[in-house]
Amino acid sequence: MSKIYKLVILPEAQKDIRGIVLYIARELGAPQAALNLQAEFEKEINTLTEKPKRIKTVNEQPWKNAGIRKIRVKNYYIYFLVDDDEMAVKVNAVIYVGRDQTKQMGDRKMEE
């Protein structure tokens, strides 16, 4: 039986998701696409509660040493940390793939 990790979506990641959904709904005029993407984010993030270490750590430093991992959902990367002490998966960023990931992650806390 595999361990089940609790899911923690940090405030920065919550802000990212809200911003993405609002941008697609309002600026692009595609509210249904925004809702579909939000559902896809939720579905994929929820899969991380089981065997989150199946996803390898990122290659870039210092995030690799910190144990940061990422998954891709559509055109976005979802960054997260596996905290074995707390048995938690901490989602700390959701960033559009076309952006400079190193710059975007540079301003983020590794965990909270």
Give the location of each predicted region.
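Enriched for short, Lys/Arg-rich terminal
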Residues: 28, 73-77, 81-112
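Basic, Lys/Arg-enriched alpha-helical interface segments
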Residues: 1-67, 102, 110-112
